Swiss-Prot record:
Domain of life: Bacteria
Subunit description: Forms a highly interlocked heterodimer with botulinum neurotoxin type E at pH 6.0 but not at pH 7.5.
Protein name: Non-toxic nonhemagglutinin type E
Protein family membership: Belongs to the botulism non-toxic nonhemagglutinin family.
GO molecular function: metalloendopeptidase activity; zinc ion binding
Example GO BP: proteolysis
Disulfide bonds: none
A Pfam match: Peptidase_M27
Any one GO CC term of the record: extracellular region
Keywords, ordered alphabetically: Virulence
Task performed by this protein: Assembles with botulinum neurotoxin type E (BoNT/E) and protects it against pH-mediated inactivation or protease activity at pH 2.6 (the pH of the animal gastrointestinal tract) but not at pH 6.0. The non-toxic component is necessary to maintain toxicity.
Amino acid sequence: MKINGNLNIDSPVDNKNVAIVRSRNQMFFKAFQVAPNIWIAPERYYGESLKINEDQKSDGGIYDSNFLSTNNEKDEFLQATIKLLQRINNNVVGAKLLSLISTAIPFPYENNTEDYRQTNYLSSKNNEHYYTANLVIFGPGSNIIKNNVIYYKKEYAENGMGTMLEIWFQPFLTHKYDEFYVDPALELIKCLIKSLYYLYGIKPNDNLNIPYRLRNEFNSLEYSELDMIDFLISGGIDYKLLNTNPYWFIDKYFIDTSKNFEKYKNDYEIKIKNNNYIANSIKLYLEQKFKINVKDIWELNLSYFSKEFQIMMPERYNNALNHYYRKEFYVIDYFKNYNINGFKNGQIKTKLPLSKYNKEIINKPELIVNLINQNNTVLMKSNFYGDGLKGNVDNFYSNYIIPYNLNYEHSINYSYLDNVNIEEIEKIPPINDEDIYPYRKNADTFIPVYNITKAKEINTTTPLPVNYLQAQMIDSNDINLSSDFLKVISSKGSLVYSFLNNTMDYLEFIKYDKPIDTDKKYYKWLKAIFRNYSLDITETQEISNQFGDTKIIPWIGRALNILNTNNSFVEEFKNLGPIFLINKKENITIPKIKIDEIPSSMLNFSFKDLSENLFNIYCKNNFYLKKIYYNFLDQWWTQYYSQYFDLICMASKSVLAQEKLIKKLIQKQLRYLMENSNISSTNLILINLTTTNTLRDISNQSQIAINNIDKFFNNAAMCVFENNIYPKFTSFMEQCIKNINKSTKEFILKCTNINETEKSHLIMQNSFSNLDFDFLDIQNMKNLFNLYTELLIKEQTSPYELSLYAFQEQDNNVIGDTSGKNTLVEYPKDIGLVYGINNNAIHLTGANQNIKFTNDYFENGLTNNFSIYFWLRNLNQNTIKSKLIGSKEDNCGWEIYFENNGLVFNIIDSNGNEKNIYLSNISNKSWHYIVISINRLKDQLLIFIDNILVANEDIKEILNIYSSDIISLLSDNNNVYIEGLSVLNKTINSNEILTDYFSDLNNSYIRNFDEEILQYNRTYELFNYVFPEIAINKIEQNNNIYLSNNNENSLNFKPLKFKLLNTNPNKQYVQKWDEVIFSVLDGTEKYLDISIDNNRIQLVDNKNNAKTFIINNDIFISNCLTLTYNNVNVYLSIKNQDYNWVICDLNHDIPKKSYLWILKNI
């Protein structure tokens, strides 16, 4: 799909890609066609007034009638939206999505027999020109942060015919989901997926909603409901656990929609395909449209796209986050912060400025909770906000009868849109002006809908979690902490609540100490604050009770007033169990069932016919039992888990609130120090930098706490399912089984055409002897949660801050870093390499050989843990001091050096406090595995050599070791080999060291698909990671034989057989960095070469003409390998000439996965 990026707001009207067009309400606007049938209108959406009444404004909305009013703003909107479309198009599945939208033209309206009119068009003034349009992307309506998708005609959107649509979109403002910025590309993808429901005419009825969550904030039972499209699009765990459809849907949406789609597909074949009055382009678009199965669209969801684009998104209750989560908006500068790969520095590390609009966010709570005393005096007001979903007080489950005969199951799976052929679509000529015969009644009148919120108000004398949470929040920078909740709410804002016992005790302990007026005093104070906060916020406790063993969080009771009675939270939880963490405990409705009787017409069947029909009924009953299970599961998810999720959200907010308080406390102390001390400016700069790093480390500790919260409440929810819901399910199921067995037996005994032996056989065969829960595996549910244990998802980077690699090229040696931290590596050209313990090792020999690694992550400080490890082989005797590795500045930091034939680790802080640890003699010319681990929380330094602990030192007196952002690897006249130098941002324990030590020894071998070591001269089939089920085969073209992957018709191609050959005929196993030749068994033996014409991998007959490839493994996917020639990767191309070619060239736009190869045993 080609995106036209050569447009701007001043582009002249050409009535092709730039036009002045008419809106539904007869207004005119300038529109730009950026891709076939996809238009952008850089205007506010015309259908809503930009000035609305206050009561019409939505909670959380922002309203500015002047937004997007100047030509500069409009051009920025146009460029930003084009860039987002280019980002989507830059990924294979994104390009397929856009191609699918481009081809999905609505079915022409049958005006008269053989008179078909187009409904997807825009028209110019006076209807002089018509332009085909499937969708138009506008700016937002009255609420400038609301994205929306609006169909043209509701009837066509639902009956299979399809209709064009309009998207309202805000590209400039985004928000954080706590740790990460929401990527606007994923927000646009959501709108684009939704547009397919309208273009294909498969929109569900407006009343088809799913019970989504029980609103824990109201006293009465009230549900939030999710409409069907949002459910299907949302993805995440919601999608997996709410996939009970159609177990409890009476509505036949999936069945009827499929029929409607097939009807129009059939009409295309009969009425359109050979109709000479319809333009060929229209027919070609419809042909491509109907190559897609409607099920493919149902299976498109945000989880799939977020995975393919490597975009982070919330995984649970994505559609109901607003009820606890108030957004703050940030401004995206698409020139500075964003490119076609997303945020330039990632979703976490990018720094965006806060929007000026944050002060104008509409504040309309759904519920106001007044905490009152015995005199009815209001002590505090707390707000509950709506989740933006429809509310319903009816209990769906109490009225629902599980259907017996509705057996269609829409299973969840990811659609890879394999039937979308981008190359074919790009060849379709545009639909010209003269090809369009417009149907004038193609649109309904747009009527704005405003979500008017009226707050309810309740009084309570018992503080609720929301009251406790509010008491932990303050806007002022001048804070005073108190652990007395009642004292805080009586203080009228001068105090703020904290449940951090150790931290509060420490602050009380030092309250009367002398002022902190030196850097040393400050460092000690800062270190103590960090230590106590860490101990408080990450505290967990193992308990055992009647519900099993579990790890609980003791401070939850104090933080949110849950089980916060005279006993401790731990004791209350032990006695009452996890069900008492939530308010609404008795919600399970025993499902209504209706099982059909066995037809009396079968009474005189023969044994054979009776056996066959009874077996079908048995299977149907078994499937019905599965429906009953999913009904129970859905009730648990909707009514119970939603309450635990609320607690996860509130407890996580509490952690973040405490973190904010501690950071304000630190900043307050830092201001005092800067204003009231005689510390030099140089040292003040160092203190500032160190404090910044400590604030980062505090955030890391908070993340650990949030992960603990997630695990604790998820385990509690699972425990409630097992102990409170599952027994009701089994009891009910046993009764169902008993009734089914009874009716089956009674029927068989009445049968007239079989003997007693046959009756006994049929009774035994068709009775449920035991309750067999093949469809129920609680462990699978637990595993599902374990995949998403972080509510505030951290950017998925490894803990490595440096991971050294080295390899040989033709003319020089290359040294680099695989940590992904953008490390600058500087080294002399004459650096030597040798094969080491597991890989290439650096050989340091000459004087002053110096390798420098530079990145911001190397800056140590007062509180950060880190570890260093490497393989070392020393060939010298070192009697005098000889440096090896270090990170020091102004004699502050750490270093490793040789002295007295041993190795010394030195660490020194900015105040001159120093620790030197001499290690044993390592000058025996053998390889040694060195690990150094610094734990600042425990004030502990551990050193291991070859898996043996050789040093365990207290470093309590070591304060700030802030050093430069450079780590140097020095020769200093040494003669040493260094391999695998790595620096991590965490400690390493002995078990990890043991594992790494032995895995390194074993890890030098390349693995096949089954994790077996690859062998030379053994036969394999070759696959690409993108298409792991389709083997590489050959394509003959222009007298050449190329390697390809034909993923459309692979049955017609025979997989090739490959052997790996080594120049050393005695070598048996394939190792990293081996130089290999590929032999191909294709009648006669052939070999792999690279075509000089097109860089494709081709087969040649002469081994002397074969290319020698460097083979390596992927560091993240152990059973995948990479192949390079002259440091250029071999990859699988996007489809070209109906084939995915195997190519070796420098194409930076190919996704990384295309470089990964798999060898499978034959």
